[in-house]
Swiss-Prot record:
Residues binding ATP: 33-40
Keyword set, alphabetical order: ATP-binding, Cell inner membrane, Cell membrane, Membrane, Nucleotide-binding, Translocase, Transport
Chief localization: membrane
NCBIfam families, alphabetized: PRK03695.1 (NF002981)
Matching SMART domains: AAA (SM00382)
Protein name as annotated: Vitamin B12 import ATP-binding protein BtuD
Cellular compartments per GO CC: plasma membrane
Length: 249
């Protein structure tokens, strides 16, 4: 797999690093760790929203060399839950994120996959928290999907499963898997270790802004590593062919 992003000694004040790593095309990378581990800080830095020590290369160029317009063509970023900036119909909000605004069928497909069909005419300020989260997810997917944006390379998601029910989480997993198969690199933070164990290709385990472990999900999500990160004991079980992590008292 080709390297999409390379991080070298990335650090921000006392909140992050220094840490190094790489993001590869066609893979799903999960950032896991307790609250305050630095996951959101790292994602914002990788998105080019903040600056600090160390270097980040994106598609072979220094991240700081990218203009905002060009960066938006090659990467999409979902920050943590935020309220709608202003009121507009959902379909209009989604269209604003499309580089090819003629692809109405793609908009409808993505909206349908996230059960937003009947929300397209509703105003963004009339949505529940879960509905707004799904609209935001649909927007970044439409921004970066190779189906309409051949330049799309990287999707960064900060706790995308927030406010989603089980069916909606499954729908998002299917979308992310399809994007990954099309060559997109996906980096997302997660608090659900079992979800990471099922769906991530690789994981970075963070604590206090430091990288405790990185590698394949099975190598990272070990009871020993998790005990170091969370200060509690874990067991890893195999149940009907599925691996599962449980905490022990």
């Amino acid at each position: 797999m080709s390297i999409v992003m390379q991080l070298q000694d990335v650090a921000e004040s006392t909140r992050l690093g220094p840490l190094s790593g790489e993001v590869r095309a066609g893979e799903i990378l999960h950032l896991v760790g307790p609250n305050g581990a630095g996951k959101s800080t790292l994602l914002a830095r990788m998105a080019g929203m903040t600056s600090g020590k160390g270097s980040i290369q994106f598609a072979g160029q220094p991240l700081e060399a990218w203009s905002a317009t060009k960066l938006a063509l090659h990467r999409a970023y979902l920050s943590q839950q935020q309220t709608p900036p202003f009121a507009m119909p959902v379909w209009h909000y989604l269209t604003l994120h499309q580089h090819d605004k003629t692809r109405t069928e793609l908009l409808n497909d993505v909206a349908g996959a996230l059960a937003l069909d009947d929300k397209l005419g509703r105003s963004t300020n009339q949505l529940s928290g879960g509905e707004w989260q799904r609209v935001r997810l649909a927007a970044v997917v439409l921004q970066i999907t190779p189906q309409a944006n051949p330049a799309g390379q990287l999707l960064l998601l900060d706790e995308p499963m927030n406010s989603l029910d089980v069916a909606q989480q499954s729908a998002l997993d299917k979308i992310l898997s399809a994007l990954c198969q099309q060559g997109l690199a996906i980096v997302m933070s997660s608090h659900d270790l079992n979800h990471t164990l099922r769906h991530a290709h690789r994981a970075w385990l963070l604590k206090g802004g430091k990288m405790l472990a990185s590698g394949r999900r099975e190598e990272v999500l070990t009871p020993a590593n998790l005990a170091q990160a969370y200060g509690m004991n874990f067991r890893r079980l195999d149940i009907e062919g599925h691996r599962m992590l449980i905490s022990t008292i």
